[in-house]
Amino acid sequence: MNMDFLRQQHVSESLLKDVENFRKQYPLTEDMQVRVPNPPIPFYGKDILEMSIATLLKGENLLLSGGKATGKNILAENLSYIFGRPSYNISFHVNVDSAALVGTDTFIDNEVRLRKGMVTLCAENGGFGVFDEINMAKNDAVSVLHAALDYRGIIDIPGYDRIELHPATRFIGTLNYGYAGTKELNEA
């Protein structure tokens, strides 16, 4: 897939130029290239694409809501591809806790070390973190994300480092309303 699908939909050329500049400003290391998705299905919807691209270019995160099978994950994957960013997909369910997101202690070579979670890896590498079904997350899991998602842009891991988000890092949450196991998200 290439960027022609955006031009075929008449997505704003100025937005596409801004995306090109973003990609030049934040080049990827070779080892991160493998994490950039190549979506098998292009997302079609000019208005939604333009709003999403503009939001991400402004340094904001996205929350995509809608019914089941409406293309939220396809859009998220396409946005990672468009921006040329590594994608970190985190599916929320009852067993996802804060340690699964930011990291947990592990024993390596006779010492305790941090095994980094997906959110930490995303933050360090300037990735696009896709929070799939974020409204199924437990409160303690979501609470560790607040400092990363607000103006602070940090992840503070007790006993380890304080990680500042790479300037290209963005988070995209997806949610379905009204399904079993889902709940309202708080304003934070």
Language-model features: locations:
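AAA+ P-loop NTPase catalytic core and its hallmark functional loops
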Residues: 1-188
